[in-house]
Amino acid sequence: MKSRQEIKKQAKQMIAEDNLWLALGLPCLVLVLVNLAFAFNESATGVSSAISGLTLLYELCASLYVFDILTKQHLVGKQLGRKISDMFGSLTAHTFKTGLLVGFITGLWFFLPYIIGIGLIVAALVSNSFGILFWLGVALLLFGGFIGLIKTYEYALAIYLAKTNEELGLFALLKESKQKMKGHKLTLFVQNLSFFWWGLGVFATGGLLGLYVTPYVLAANTIFATEVLGINDSENPRKESDLEVF
């Protein structure tokens, strides 16, 4: 298992080859700019929800594309348009359904305790009481965030397992991911936390820095997944002679 520093170094090198960072980051930047364009338009409230959904779909496709490259299932094309096309082409019906299920289940863990907690807090405030009801609501808010985060990391491998195990059922994939992530959840959390300052940079630039940071983070997380899954092909650097010319 590579160290966090080795994984991040490999991720940087990978997205630098053939300007892969541009192919991965450009769709994300377009989504950010469209979202900003409608951010102050009250009549376009549904646009933000649509952009959020498209962003999740983009991240799913980008992660699978990086995974395909790492596992030698896909060679990197020369042209930008071909790279972007290949990225969205990495999505399969099985990985899409797996991604939906993961999103639904983790969403339930996050939002059900949150909604109930908010309800209890509002009820406590209306009744002008800061007793058990109020603190139970606060506890549910904290519980929802904590357990939702754990579930997010437990199912972090599900889409990659779906890519390589088309015969496995959706819940079997989640169970397998949960099993394989034992002992690795905190490591991945710390790795993601190490991008904190990059995240601030993205915020400070209105999302523009995400053109580079988003591919960097996605590549690092996908490399981490290949390490946990024991896919050693990710250790072999791609050679210019291996690339298809389009």
Question: Which functions belong to the PLM regions below?
Answer:
Residues 1-16, 53-115, 119-132, 155-185, ...:
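Membrane-interface segments at transmembrane-helix boundaries
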Residues 23-59, 98-127, 135-152, 188-218:
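Hydrophobic alpha-helical transmembrane segments in multi-pass membrane proteins
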